[in-house]
Amino acid sequence: MIPGGYAMNVLVTGVAGFIGFHVARRLLDDGHRVVGIDNLNPYYDPALKRDRLARVGSNGEFTFRKLDLADRGGMEEVFAGERFDAVVHLAAQAGVRHSIENPHVYVGSNLTGFLHILEGCRHHGVPHLVYASSSSVYGANTKMPFSVHDNVDHPVSLYAATKKANELMAHTYAALYGIPCTGLRFFTVYGPWGRPDMALFTFTRAILEGRAIDIYNYGDMQRDFTYIDDIIEGVYRIMFLIPRADPTWDGSRPDPGTSFAPSRIYNIGGSHPVNLMHFIEVLEKALGRQAEKNMLPLQKGDVKATCADALDLEAAVGFRPGVPVEEGIQRFVEWYRSYYRV
């Protein structure tokens, strides 16, 4: 049940968040110990975050600390007080569109906070840092599918820029201090206990309340929707794959997908982009209701399409996401109706 045959002590940041909650539950279910931190900020309903925590906290091998990543002293205490076998860093100020309107809030969590994570790993000998990047780093790229071997130097939102910065910072610490770091570019994650600011959640709520849904770029959009269980499986497997320096890396022909340092990047996505209008049709069928639609132009910071090249992930850990949206949306709707009693 436990790869390597022993129970690990794992720090999970953003443990009350959508992905962090599911990662913590998987680790605990498989016999590991989890120390979770989260600042429980009001970016979206803190009650949902507390309910997630309540379900994680029922396991005796879980310890929670309410803490902001930007709190340098608090973060130093966390690392000094425990010996971690791995850090899974999932905390961040999320939201592409939110970063356009509120740029300053992204600095503390996504940049300063990430530096504190790197410093903790450096000074306390953490064997592996796994951190969340994002498909948004591909920015203005139009070559499909998006590959980790492509350059990602043209972000179109501050959120994407902070995630790209995280990748650069992690690589720097891997190169300077030998800290094994793995970044995971998540592609449009959805599923039970999801974020209320994400499309599936907002569409579901609006349709059930009889309100219109906003559809950008007049519906001409595609997303590589990736079900939460597939994301968690990828994170879990990668956690046990500690990266090593690639002796074949050539600085005269630098490949972004590998490195002379113990640093790697992987996409986690299904490689099957779904048209937004089809996604909505599947949701309408699952809800048994039709949506009233507001057709709007493409928003700043948004992109028309995403599609993951997950071949590197599959080659590394023998897994690629596979839950179809028809199944994933049905599971989400069942959870939503049960949780909100509608």
Language-model features: locations:
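Hydrophobic alpha-helix immediately C-terminal to the catalytic Tyr-X-X-X-Lys motif of short-chain
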Residues: A165, M169, Y173, F203, ...
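N-terminal Rossmann-like NAD(P)+-binding domain of SDR-like oxidoreductases, especially those catalyzing
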Residues: M1-V189, M239, F319, R331, ...
